[in-house]
Regions:
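C-terminal structural segment of proteins
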Residues: 1-172
Length: 172
Protein backbone atom coordinates (compact mmCIF):
# COMPACT_ATOMS: atom_id res chain seq x y z
CA UNK A 1 0.00 0.00 0.00
CA UNK A 2 1.32 3.43 -0.91
CA UNK A 3 1.48 6.13 1.75
CA UNK A 4 -1.45 8.53 2.04
CA UNK A 5 -2.86 11.04 4.50
CA UNK A 6 -6.06 10.17 6.36
CA UNK A 7 -8.61 12.96 6.87
CA UNK A 8 -11.82 12.48 8.88
CA UNK A 9 -14.43 14.92 7.60
CA UNK A 10 -16.52 16.73 10.18
CA UNK A 11 -19.18 17.64 7.65
CA UNK A 12 -20.17 17.35 4.02
CA UNK A 13 -18.81 20.79 3.13
CA UNK A 14 -15.43 20.00 4.68
CA UNK A 15 -15.27 16.69 2.81
CA UNK A 16 -15.99 18.42 -0.50
CA UNK A 17 -13.44 21.13 0.24
CA UNK A 18 -10.76 18.52 0.95
CA UNK A 19 -11.55 16.62 -2.25
CA UNK A 20 -11.18 19.86 -4.22
CA UNK A 21 -7.93 20.79 -2.42
CA UNK A 22 -6.39 17.36 -2.99
CA UNK A 23 -7.24 16.18 -6.53
CA UNK A 24 -5.60 12.77 -5.96
CA UNK A 25 -7.79 12.08 -2.92
CA UNK A 26 -10.70 9.66 -2.66
CA UNK A 27 -13.72 9.53 -0.35
CA UNK A 28 -13.96 6.56 2.02
CA UNK A 29 -17.08 5.24 3.70
CA UNK A 30 -17.36 1.44 3.89
CA UNK A 31 -14.16 0.86 1.93
CA UNK A 32 -15.23 -2.53 0.57
CA UNK A 33 -13.63 -1.93 -2.84
CA UNK A 34 -11.22 0.93 -2.22
CA UNK A 35 -9.26 -0.56 0.69
CA UNK A 36 -8.45 -3.87 -1.08
CA UNK A 37 -7.48 -1.88 -4.20
CA UNK A 38 -5.09 0.20 -2.11
CA UNK A 39 -3.67 -2.86 -0.34
CA UNK A 40 -2.93 -4.59 -3.65
CA UNK A 41 -1.51 -1.36 -5.12
CA UNK A 42 -4.18 -1.27 -7.80
CA UNK A 43 -5.05 2.28 -6.72
CA UNK A 44 -3.04 5.12 -5.28
CA UNK A 45 -4.34 8.18 -3.43
CA UNK A 46 -2.77 11.19 -1.78
CA UNK A 47 -5.51 11.47 0.86
CA UNK A 48 -8.43 9.39 2.09
CA UNK A 49 -11.38 11.53 3.15
CA UNK A 50 -13.37 9.53 5.70
CA UNK A 51 -17.13 10.07 5.36
CA UNK A 52 -18.20 7.31 7.74
CA UNK A 53 -19.28 9.61 10.58
CA UNK A 54 -21.24 12.14 8.55
CA UNK A 55 -24.83 12.33 9.74
CA UNK A 56 -25.84 13.99 6.46
CA UNK A 57 -25.30 10.64 4.72
CA UNK A 58 -27.46 8.62 7.10
CA UNK A 59 -31.15 7.88 7.38
CA UNK A 60 -34.10 6.44 5.53
CA UNK A 61 -37.07 8.75 5.13
CA UNK A 62 -40.40 8.61 3.33
CA UNK A 63 -40.96 11.87 1.45
CA UNK A 64 -44.41 11.84 -0.12
CA UNK A 65 -44.36 9.29 -2.93
CA UNK A 66 -40.63 8.62 -2.64
CA UNK A 67 -38.20 6.99 -0.24
CA UNK A 68 -34.88 8.71 0.40
CA UNK A 69 -32.02 6.46 1.52
CA UNK A 70 -28.82 8.10 2.74
CA UNK A 71 -25.62 7.16 0.92
CA UNK A 72 -23.96 6.14 4.19
CA UNK A 73 -26.56 3.51 4.98
CA UNK A 74 -25.01 0.07 5.23
CA UNK A 75 -26.42 -2.81 3.21
CA UNK A 76 -27.68 -4.58 6.34
CA UNK A 77 -29.49 -1.40 7.41
CA UNK A 78 -31.21 -1.11 4.03
CA UNK A 79 -32.17 -4.80 4.19
CA UNK A 80 -33.65 -4.62 7.69
CA UNK A 81 -35.37 -1.23 7.57
CA UNK A 82 -39.18 -1.54 7.95
CA UNK A 83 -39.85 1.33 5.51
CA UNK A 84 -37.70 -0.25 2.80
CA UNK A 85 -39.25 -3.67 3.46
CA UNK A 86 -42.79 -2.32 3.12
CA UNK A 87 -42.33 0.08 0.18
CA UNK A 88 -39.47 -1.49 -1.81
CA UNK A 89 -39.39 -5.15 -0.71
CA UNK A 90 -37.25 -6.25 -3.65
CA UNK A 91 -34.61 -3.65 -2.74
CA UNK A 92 -34.62 -4.84 0.89
CA UNK A 93 -34.24 -8.42 -0.32
CA UNK A 94 -31.44 -7.46 -2.71
CA UNK A 95 -29.54 -5.62 0.06
CA UNK A 96 -29.81 -8.67 2.30
CA UNK A 97 -28.07 -10.83 -0.30
CA UNK A 98 -25.08 -8.58 -1.01
CA UNK A 99 -21.72 -10.22 -0.36
CA UNK A 100 -21.37 -11.87 3.03
CA UNK A 101 -22.30 -10.68 6.53
CA UNK A 102 -19.06 -8.70 6.85
CA UNK A 103 -19.65 -6.86 3.58
CA UNK A 104 -23.28 -6.15 4.52
CA UNK A 105 -22.11 -4.75 7.86
CA UNK A 106 -19.56 -2.35 6.31
CA UNK A 107 -20.52 -1.67 2.70
CA UNK A 108 -22.73 1.31 1.88
CA UNK A 109 -25.36 2.15 -0.69
CA UNK A 110 -23.41 5.23 -1.79
CA UNK A 111 -20.14 3.37 -2.15
CA UNK A 112 -21.69 0.66 -4.28
CA UNK A 113 -23.48 3.19 -6.48
CA UNK A 114 -20.36 5.36 -6.89
CA UNK A 115 -18.20 2.35 -7.77
CA UNK A 116 -20.68 1.04 -10.40
CA UNK A 117 -19.17 -2.43 -10.45
CA UNK A 118 -20.94 -4.46 -13.15
CA UNK A 119 -21.25 -7.33 -10.64
CA UNK A 120 -23.07 -5.10 -8.12
CA UNK A 121 -26.83 -5.19 -7.68
CA UNK A 122 -27.67 -1.61 -6.68
CA UNK A 123 -26.95 0.00 -10.09
CA UNK A 124 -29.47 -2.26 -11.84
CA UNK A 125 -32.01 -1.63 -9.08
CA UNK A 126 -31.60 2.15 -9.41
CA UNK A 127 -32.12 1.93 -13.16
CA UNK A 128 -35.15 -0.36 -12.86
CA UNK A 129 -36.78 1.85 -10.23
CA UNK A 130 -36.00 5.17 -12.00
CA UNK A 131 -34.11 6.36 -8.93
CA UNK A 132 -32.41 9.73 -8.58
CA UNK A 133 -28.87 10.04 -7.22
CA UNK A 134 -28.61 13.09 -4.97
CA UNK A 135 -25.13 14.55 -4.66
CA UNK A 136 -23.80 17.50 -2.73
CA UNK A 137 -24.02 19.50 -5.97
CA UNK A 138 -26.97 18.23 -8.03
CA UNK A 139 -29.54 15.51 -8.67
CA UNK A 140 -28.93 12.96 -11.44
CA UNK A 141 -31.47 10.46 -12.75
CA UNK A 142 -30.07 6.92 -12.73
CA UNK A 143 -30.26 6.63 -16.52
CA UNK A 144 -27.84 9.57 -16.81
CA UNK A 145 -25.72 8.63 -13.79
CA UNK A 146 -24.34 5.25 -14.88
CA UNK A 147 -22.05 5.71 -17.89
CA UNK A 148 -20.39 2.30 -18.21
CA UNK A 149 -18.43 -0.25 -16.22
CA UNK A 150 -16.95 1.46 -13.14
CA UNK A 151 -17.90 4.81 -14.68
CA UNK A 152 -20.45 7.35 -13.45
CA UNK A 153 -21.37 10.99 -14.00
CA UNK A 154 -19.79 11.95 -10.65
CA UNK A 155 -17.17 14.67 -10.76
CA UNK A 156 -13.96 14.05 -8.74
CA UNK A 157 -15.06 16.42 -5.96
CA UNK A 158 -18.72 15.35 -5.95
CA UNK A 159 -20.21 13.16 -3.22
CA UNK A 160 -23.34 11.05 -3.23
CA UNK A 161 -25.57 12.18 -0.37
CA UNK A 162 -28.60 9.94 -0.92
CA UNK A 163 -30.66 8.01 -3.43
CA UNK A 164 -34.34 8.81 -3.94
CA UNK A 165 -36.62 5.99 -5.08
CA UNK A 166 -40.17 6.49 -6.30
CA UNK A 167 -42.41 4.18 -4.31
CA UNK A 168 -44.19 1.92 -6.79
CA UNK A 169 -47.97 1.53 -6.59
CA UNK A 170 -47.46 -2.21 -6.36
CA UNK A 171 -44.54 -4.28 -5.19
CA UNK A 172 -43.87 -7.98 -4.78
Amino acid sequence: MHAFEYLRAGGLKQAGDWLRQHPESRPLSGGMTLVPSLKHRLAQVSHLVDLSRLGELRGIERQGSSLRIGAGMRHEEVASDPQVQSTLPALAHLAGLIGDPQVRARGTLGGSVANNDPAADYPAALLALDAVVITDQREIVAADFFLGMFSTALQPDELIVAVRFQVPRRAA
